[in-house]
Amino acid sequence: MAVGMMSLAVLGQTQSALQAQSRERTMFVSVLESDGTPVQGLVTADFVIEEDGVEREVLRVGRARAPMQLAVLVDTSGSAALAISDIRTGLEAFVSRLLESNELTLVTFGGPPRILVESTDQIDRLRGGIGRIFAYSDSAAYLLDALVETALGFERRESPRPVIVVLTSEGLDYSNHSSEQVLEALQASHVATHVILLKNLTNTGLGPSRFGNLDFGDSLFQRDQVLERGPRTTGGQRRDLLTSSATPDALDGLAGILTSQYEVVYSRPASLIPPEEIAVRMRRSDLTAQGIPARRTRD
């Protein structure tokens, strides 16, 4: 009888522990100063997590050490032709800095999306792929399609810490997906989306007449919605560059942000209804925070 009672007691304690653990939730958070510099050394009291406007208790804060699964999406349409050399230079340093403990894949979207290098932690394969990045003068971009396909790939693999980095021009986009479809796919896969937008690139030979009767006004509107809302709603960053020569510095800055992220663990009361909105902010007004909820692992 005593053994039976002890077994029940242990079982009850185990169930309580599992229930408590199931109520813990995690966010990956970037904290920046006003000049965009990542901030280190923060503690639980510095963070505020809110679910549907209700503040939750922050339990633990530490450096994010979970491996990242990064997909770098590169514009190889005709509009990006003048930037390709700077993109290659920036990516060489970017992948070298981020490869430790992480995996990267290269995807191009000048024409239909194409996986240039499958997910790997091998620097030689990535360098080889970077060397094969070329612009196609007669191609429009398919950025929105590339984002959806990449997000769905992360969803199928149940990637625990997925990240998308987009390098894109403002050229024509021939995608079949709408902005809402893209944003839904990004949020469903819990993928932080970062954008480096190369502005003022021109290719006078690439015009709407090349691509039939597509409504390019709506196409560009859909693309711009994704570039504006994607980073903001997924805990990412957006950087607009007036010259492609700034690409290496922009990628280096993004690498610094990604390697300086926090893993913030907070408590959520037991509920059958998940919150519609999860937000993170800092108690210090001079700091800004962007974060995305981590995917829950299966029990």
Each language-model region and where it sits:
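Bacterial N-terminal signal peptides
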Residues: 1-9
